[in-house]
Amino acid sequence: MSQENVEVVRGVRIALSPASERASQRRALDERLAIRFPSLYRLLADALMRLPPRSRLRRLVLARRVRQAYAASNRRDIDAVFVGWDPNIEYRPSEDLMPPDLEGAFHGHDGYLALWRYWRDAFDDIRWDPEEVLDLGDRLLVETQQRGHGSGSGVAVSEPVFQLFTFRSGLVIRQEDFRDRAKALEAAGLRK
């Protein structure tokens, strides 16, 4: 491979294995504890995000937490998703995935739920399967595969979506989605 075809990206890559069947169907003990004791979860999440990205402990816990968060989303367990999100989160879905009548940014848990209802109306079985995480310190870039079938047409959809999460005090304060990897890397500050 020639040198000009190699793209150097900073950050720590974490390859993800698929979530277990059990995790896909129900909450794990640590998820139940996080929901029951959100203040404790926030303290631990903040401590985790303060570890250096190359820390083995950070990589292991982040891999588990990312798999759990996506499994919770895929099983429609919103409480398990929101435990890791700031109440004032800003969510920016990919512009080319949104119809023109919906706003470009959604704010707070209520804004996310409004968008979630839109996705559920459009796709009966929409899901996101995380494949890789790029740990950038206070941000994570997660490569996912979005899958589903159109509610009216039944047409299958499967495409990559890159989700950039920004953290503060261990909680997600911003999520941006991209269909294009280059745009996601640029938004993460990794390309000029």
Which residues does each PLM region occupy?
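C-terminal and inter-domain tail/linker signature
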Residues: M1-K192
